């Protein structure tokens, strides 16, 4: 993957070089996207649209921190979908981790969550945000214990894990594929910004239907698929049940009870 790689703090240039090597990123002046290492964090910027601002992973403050404190605990839809309301604390593989928000919610409720992000730039942002969260005095201990990023940013990462006999299969596989966003649907300013940048960088997950089969092969208890309320079932496969919110629904494919 080629994009602009910019280091604002010269003392951290070697860190940016390591990061680029890990995620197989290389510099080009031609790209409209810049991955910028500031003194505080790693950011993604759309060079030709500076008003959009920077995208970065913040698991400590902002909307994520607010949701951790006031988000409704195990009563919220994602927790019910993952089976936490049954008294279980399942292990989870988030197969489309993105900026890590849903994985963080599940981890904050006690789940051990392994994350896979197929796009290397997004994975690099997530890795950086996770490293900062692990240093935080309030949440660092349990983030370190419960959240990990699997360094697999290929499109067949789930297939590879399903076939790996050494890999301990999770109770739950969680999927939230990028879905084409209709213009007439209202979104918050932050989500709009992120969607615009991501969809121009990553594109919609046009192969998302292909994620369901390996997810079902990996999960021992259930697969949870987050969908916009207007979207079809993933791979046109009817779920065992659906948990609906105002704008989304969680389609749940049950393989075994959570007990």
Curated annotation (Swiss-Prot):
Q: Where in the cell is it found?
A: Cytoplasm
The reaction(s) catalysed by this protein are: guanosine(1516) in 16S rRNA + S-adenosyl-L-methionine = N(2)-methylguanosine(1516) in 16S rRNA + S-adenosyl-L-homocysteine + H(+)
- Gene3D superfamilies reported for this sequence: Vaccinia Virus protein VP39, YhiQ-like domain
Does the record bear Methyltransferase in its keywords?
yes
Record-level Gene Ontology MF annotations: rRNA (guanine-N2-)-methyltransferase activity
Q: Which residues bind S-adenosyl-L-methionine?
A: 101-102, 117-118, 153-154, 176
Keyword rRNA processing tagged:
yes
Pfam families in alphabetical order: SAM_MT
E.C. number, please? 2.1.1.242
GO cellular component annotations of the record:
cytoplasm
- Annotated keywords: Cytoplasm, Methyltransferase, rRNA processing, S-adenosyl-L-methionine, Transferase
Show the InterPro entries listed in the entry: 16SrRNA_methylTrfase_J (IPR007536), SAM-dependent_MTases_sf (IPR029063)
State the superkingdom.
Bacteria
**Family membership:** Belongs to the methyltransferase superfamily. RsmJ family.
What does the protein in this record do?
Answer: Specifically methylates the guanosine in position 1516 of 16S rRNA.
* Name of the protein in question: Ribosomal RNA small subunit methyltransferase J
Q: What is the lineage of its organism?
A: Bacteria, Pseudomonadati, Pseudomonadota, Gammaproteobacteria, Vibrionales
Recorded name of the encoding gene = rsmJ
